[in-house]
Amino acid sequence: MIQPPLPPLRTLFFEDLSVGMTERLNKTVAASDVVGFAQLTGDRNPIHLSEHFAAKTSFRTRIAHGLYTASLISAVLGTRLPGPGAVYISQTLNFRAPVKIGDTVIVTVTVAELVAEKCRARLACQCEVGGEVVLDGEAWVKVPSENAKGKRPVPRL
């Protein structure tokens, strides 16, 4: 299946954010994504790569790496909310259910709290497949300020 191109980059500055702002990303997990993630990370657990092995597990089929699914959250943070220039500080992850090859993951990131004196945002993060939450948690990010010297660390695209 051909994936649509990634959404254009968008930088939001701390001053642009408000509690409740939300961004979403939909991604269908391809077998090639899982193989590529295994090659990139070195995690070659056969539950991800071997249909024969996976068939003998409780999942009955190959599943995506949990951190592959979590990396889709990073895609939202780095490209849309807040976008380029934001720096990850921390991330909690709760893995609730497996993600299988062919599943479409819907990633939702919502601004939950803003700390003005440090230009930090707490973001509620959730991944769903077919209406079921498969991963949730929260992220803290440092967000560029429009009032900082040099103003724009990256251009708005």
Residue ranges: model-predicted function:
Residues 37, 73, 79, 156-157:
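Terminal targeting signals and extreme-terminal segments of soluble enzymes
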